[in-house]
Amino acid sequence: MYDVIVIGAGPAGLQAALTLGRMHRSALLLDSGEYRNGTVLHMHNVAANDGTPPADFRAIARAQLAEYADVEVRDARVERIDGEQGAFTLELADGGTVAARRIVLATGMADELPAISGLQELWGVGAFSCPFCDGHEHAGKPIAVIGEAARAAHLIGLLGRIVSSITVFPTEGSFAEEDRATLEALGAVVASSSPLSIAREGETVTLTTAEGEASVAGIFVASVVSRQRAPFAEQLGLAMLPSGAIEIDDFGRTSVAGVSAAGDIAHRASLPGAMAAVALAVAAGQLAAVGHIQSLMAEGA
């Protein structure tokens, strides 16, 4: 039986495994091979890794974990978690089972995009959601924002000082006159209708509407809906927040003893939502690991 099993090998899971390994706690890191930033070419706003390809970041982290005898890494998908603190059993997709005293969920969220032809193919390449991660790369260039008015206005406020111009498109239909006036007051050009399709050629992204085409350097989508990528919160009956995230305390502990959650799948109730950022995921992974280490030590394990 492992001290801790970490499910998910993005930044949060990798850091949790590293912290456990450094404290000589037996840990199993299970990597499904699915990552929220799996289509992203370069990650940004991460000290010492600004511009690093996420795949390189993960590869380096896994190579470093190999130096710790107490950490095992497997490419495996978990189907189900049963049990309680001190005796959790995980069923794997290959039919095997593994057991642990504690669990860290670091499975990440999945993005559900507006149903616009071509958008999914451009996600992380020509279409983005995070201005902190990808805004600077569009400095001095024209961009488009897609989304309902309130969220679009927030993005316009963040990106307006960075880019040369912003054209805002409704996700569907058209903006109400009051919303149009608000968006125009922020300096945006307001399109009359939603995009029918999106395509990219070279460095240019073209949005096609019923009225014609608009060409920009990139798109920021304000209407992304995020959901839990894995079913474990429901399986375990974890307390959830209105944002769709798992409720945690300062050390990532959930409502079920022995189960912690780290990364963008969880946040404290005092926050409106989880910020999807590599640096924050790393910090959350370390906190979750430390919480379990302290708990195990208190038990004399």
Language model regions located:
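A Rossmann-like FAD-binding core segment of flavoenzymes
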Residues: A59-L92, T97-A100, I162-E247, M297-A301
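Glycine-rich nucleotide phosphate-binding loop and flanking beta-alpha elements
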Residues: G13, R80, D111, A152, ...
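Internal hydrophobic alpha-helix adjacent to the cofactor/substrate pocket in enzyme cavities
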Residues: A17, G21-R25, S165-E172, A279-A301
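Beta1-alpha1 glycine-rich phosphate/pyrophosphate-binding loop at the start
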Residues: Y2-A59, K141-P142, A150-G173
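FAD-site-proximal beta/loop scaffold in flavoenzymes
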Residues: E121-E137, S223-L280, L287, Q294
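Active-site glycine-rich loop that binds ribose-phosphate moieties when present
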Residues: V125-C133, A144-G157, A176-E177
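FAD-binding core/adjacent interface of flavoenzyme oxidoreductases
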Residues: M1-V4, E72-G140, F220, I246-S255
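Short, well-ordered coil/turn residues at beta-beta hairpins
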Residues: G8, A100, A106-G108, L113-A115, ...
